[in-house]
């Protein structure tokens, strides 16, 4: 066990970000700022609608409101720091601030994994067992499911962050990333990180593998049920209720599985291209995905589209 005072030699980290490409920093500052504003606006509107519109007081939209709030929390934990790093010559972050950011970003990511599987279960019950839906997805059932997602994600993040921050950082303090991303921080440790790698692998199985299998099996049954619907209009209507969620799942898990699926204990020599790819994938996962979520649900869900129209009408003609 590494004692806490062994980490005292490093009191701050330097975030490399796009320091090697200074001409791109201002361009990325404007681009990410605009995307962040879209995230706040789009997800904020979805939260407002799920709370204020009585037609959306259903489990599906309660989970959607949680997802939107989660996306706002996740981006707010990292985007302001990224924006500041684009304008600041010396891009530093304290040891404690790095730990907080690592905890928040990991917690939000793990929570979203569980939350998306809960949303898949909601669609499975609604389409495959509609008569039991009011009982299985009652308020007394779906609210604990959502709360459990947050608790599970936060617990996993606490474990991973604690393990990472107890490592000794006695030499290099330059993080080759935009933020305190946990894999980038582990590369700086001057001790054996096999426990961290094993722990990360177990967490990947629990929060990536299990939800992916759960969602996959849910959609196998959902699609099989939809195909048995005799009318084309009925099949179209049934699929429209889950197409937005399926699109979000593919984008989210496709990105996060690629980024976290194989944690590396040390950075290989001459891996500059890999580091750049990791940064871009992390940026896509951290900014683009939360921006797309409300757009996807607004375009592919008729109830959300109707609620948006009602909200605009009320604001413009009230």
Curated annotation (Swiss-Prot):
One GO biological process this protein is involved in is: detection of chemical stimulus involved in sensory perception of smell
Q: Name one GO molecular function term.
A: olfactory receptor activity
GO CC: one term?
Answer: plasma membrane
Q: In this UniProt entry, which residues form the Extracellular topological domain(s)? A: 1-27, 83-100, 203-205, 260-278
Annotated protein name in UniProt? Olfactory receptor 13C7
- Please classify the protein's predominant subcellular localization into one broad category: membrane
Q: Which InterPro entries match?
A: GPCR_Rhodpsn, GPCR_Rhodpsn_7TM, Olfact_rcpt
* SUPFAM superfamilies referenced in this protein's UniProt entry, alphabetically: Family A G protein-coupled receptor-like (SSF81321)
Q: Which UniProt keywords apply?
A: Cell membrane, Membrane, Olfaction, Sensory transduction, Transducer, Transmembrane, Transmembrane helix
List the lineage, top down.
Answer: Eukaryota, Metazoa, Chordata, Craniata, Vertebrata
| Location of this chain's protein in the cell | Cell membrane
Q: What would be one Pfam family of this protein?
A: 7tm_4
List all membrane-crossing ranges.
28-48, 62-82, 101-121, 182-202, 206-226, 239-259, 279-289
Membrane side Cytoplasmic: which residues?
49-61, 122-181, 227-238, 290-318
């Amino acid at each position: 066990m590494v004692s806490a005072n062994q980490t005292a030699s490093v009191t701050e980290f330097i975030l490399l970000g796009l320091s090697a490409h200074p001409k791109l920093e201002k361009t990325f500052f404007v681009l990410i700022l605009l995307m962040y504003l879209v995230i706040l606006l789009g997800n904020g509107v979805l939260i407002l609608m799920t709370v204020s519109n009585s037609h959306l007081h259903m489990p599906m939209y309660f989970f959607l409101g949680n997802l939107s709030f989660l996306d706002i929390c996740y981006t707010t934990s990292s985007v302001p720091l990224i924006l500041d790093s684009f304008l600041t010559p010396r891009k530093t972050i304290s040891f404690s601030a790095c730990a907080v950011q690592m905890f928040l970003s990991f917690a939000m990511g793990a929570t979203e994994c569980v939350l998306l599987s809960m949303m898949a279960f909601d669609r499975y019950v609604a389409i495959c067992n509609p008569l039991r839906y009011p009982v299985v997805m009652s308020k007394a059932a779906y609210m604990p499911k959502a709360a459990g997602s947050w608790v599970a994600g936060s617990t996993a993040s606490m474990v991973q962050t604690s393990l990472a921050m107890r490592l000794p950082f006695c030499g290099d303090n330059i993080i080759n990333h935009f933020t305190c991303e946990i894999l980038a921080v582990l590369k700086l440790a001057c001790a054996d990180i096999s426990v961290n790698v094993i722990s990360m692998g177990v967490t990947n199985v629990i929060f990536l593998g299990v939800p992916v299998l759960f969602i996959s099996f849910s959609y196998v049954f959902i699609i099989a049920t939809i195909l048995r619907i005799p009318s084309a209009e009925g099949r179209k209507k049934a699929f429209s209720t889950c197409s937005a969620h399926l699109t979000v799942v593919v984008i989210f898990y496709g990105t996060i599985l690629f980024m976290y699926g194989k944690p590396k204990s040390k950075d290989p020599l001459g891996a500059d291209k890999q580091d750049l790819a990791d940064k871009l994938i992390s940026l896509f996962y951290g900014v683009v995905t939360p921006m797309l979520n409300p757009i996807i649900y607004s375009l592919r869900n008729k109830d959300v589209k109707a609620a948006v129209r009602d909200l605009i009408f009320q604001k413009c003609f009230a």
